[in-house]
Amino acid sequence: MEASSGEQRLMKLRKVIKEAFGYFDKIGNNTVQQDEVGTIMRYLGQFPSESDLKELIVPELLDDDPSRDGLVSYDAFEKMILRCLSDHLYDPDDSETLLAAFRVLDPEGRGYIDSNLMHEHLSTRGGKAADGFREREMSDFLEYAKDKESADSSRIYYEDYVAKLTADVEKHIENLYQDARGGGGRAA
């Protein structure tokens, strides 16, 4: 008996998830360190906050077997990420939401934010250093966000950044899930 198109898409989606998870499965035992869960989720197009990761997602993943010593099993991760994807729990913010956030940091309306100010805000999100970006995430963000063509490369022109970011994220997600959606067409 042949699988329905919905079942085929689910099988392909599971394959994409398994492949992404496998990149971080250092020992080959179908587990990853809990610190990698957010990275894998973002790769798969879900963008939870650090507090959601720490307070909701990771505890749920470790709840199945607390003796795993910080290791998350593939089965627990797959179950969680399939629910997140189907319910659109952590889909990326749209460009208007992102622009509104940047405008809060630019009360003068200059159209840019100094990268040092941005570093300060992102390293202490919510007023707590523990909620901020990790150093590697910070350097990756700043490298991507700064205007390299400007005479003052310490500025982040946020409208350009948001346009670039949303286009790149949409393209990545579309490419990643193209096969899982049945190939060919543009993602909705």
Q: What is the predicted role of each segment?
A:
Residues M1-D63:
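The feature marks the first
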Residues E60-Y112, H119-G132, R136-A188:
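EF-hand and EF-hand-like Ca2+-sensor regions
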